């Protein structure tokens, strides 16, 4: 993916995407505690909504407001572990938006975390709070939480 120089004139730079496929303005305007998006394939649910809005909200909340990434099957999660945030990492948006503080997102034990890699792809710093949690509906009985 080509790196993009983001600035105030870059189209859609707030969301890290040059695509104008934004189907979630109505959902975000509700300011609900839980937003659920259901729709047909390839209509802009995951990429702009989860990836950019979720990561952006996490960063803007001083790294406290994580989000849940829910799929129907755990096999769907396994396929997305590496690629889910590839768009905001590969084009340089994450580094730009955090002013160089973070430039990568990695998956570990059902959670995604921010981290900074150096030019040799060695880890310099890791975020302790996860940016997102992974859940599969078919595994819901295995999850633990408060009663």
Language-model features: locations:
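Short hydrophobic/aromatic beta-strand immediately N-terminal to the Walker A/P-loop
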Residues: 33-38, 68
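Inter-Walker segment of RecA-like/P-loop motor cores
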Residues: 84-145
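Hydrophobic positions on the alpha1 helix immediately C-terminal to the Walker A/P-loop
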Residues: 48-52
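Conserved Walker A/P-loop ATP-binding site and its immediately adjacent core
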Residues: 63-87
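Flexible, charged surface loops at secondary-structure boundaries
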Residues: 28-31, 59-64, 125-128, 144-146
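Pre-Walker A adenine-sensing motif
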Residues: 1-33
């Amino acid at each position: 993916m080509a790196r993009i120089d983001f600035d105030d004139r870059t189209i859609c730079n707030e969301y890290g995407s040059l695509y104008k496929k934004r189907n979630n303005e109505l959902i975000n305007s509700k300011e609900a505690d839980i937003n659920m998006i259901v729709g047909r394939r390839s209509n802009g649910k995951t990429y702009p909504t989860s990836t950019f809005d979720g990561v952006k909200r996490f960063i803007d909340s001083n790294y406290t407001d994580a989000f849940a990434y829910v799929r129907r099957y755990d096999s769907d999660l396994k396929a997305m572990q590496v690629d889910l945030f590839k768009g905001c990492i590969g084009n340089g948006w994450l580094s730009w938006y955090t002013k160089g503080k973070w430039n990568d997102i990695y998956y570990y034990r059902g959670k995604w975390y921010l981290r900074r890699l150096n030019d040799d792809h060695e880890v310099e710093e890791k975020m302790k709070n996860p940016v997102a949690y992974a859940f599969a509906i078919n595994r819901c009985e295995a999850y633990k939480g408060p009663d």
